[in-house]
């Protein structure tokens, strides 16, 4: 997921702002590997509902001790690799945990996507 907060489109994931972001689709039991890359100028604490993120690498280097994270703080220029065990069927929100990066008065926008886990 390329995270960006600058430019003409504002807060975006992979160059798109919600609702135009593409969901990640996985079958129940799959392992999903996601690479966070913060190309913007602000920190983005990335949060997935319904499942843990296992942080396995930072800036391209495997971690000697991977760890579970509810939120992964991705600072400008940082890169993280996470694994998610897609073991909970449903549609799960995946978003920046800074409220004004993902939500406003008329609903969700910006740094929001979903993980869809099929049975």
Show which residues each predicted segment covers.
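Copper-binding active sites and cupredoxin-like electron-transfer domains
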Residues: 1-119
């Amino acid at each position: 997921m390329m995270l960006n907060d600058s430019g003409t489109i504002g807060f975006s994931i992979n160059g798109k702002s919600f609702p135009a972001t593409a969901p990640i689709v996985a079958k129940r039991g799959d392992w999903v590997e996601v690479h966070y890359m913060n190309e913007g100028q602000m920190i983005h604490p990335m949060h997935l509902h319904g499942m843990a993120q296992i942080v396995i690498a930072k800036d391209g280097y495997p971690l000697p001790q991977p760890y579970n994270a509810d939120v992964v703080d991705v600072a400008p220029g940082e890169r993280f690799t996470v694994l998610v065990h897609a073991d909970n069927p449903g549609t799960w929100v995946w978003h920046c945990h800074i409220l004004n990066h993902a939500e406003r008065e008329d609903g969700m926008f910006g740094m929001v996507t979903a993980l869809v886990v099929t049975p």
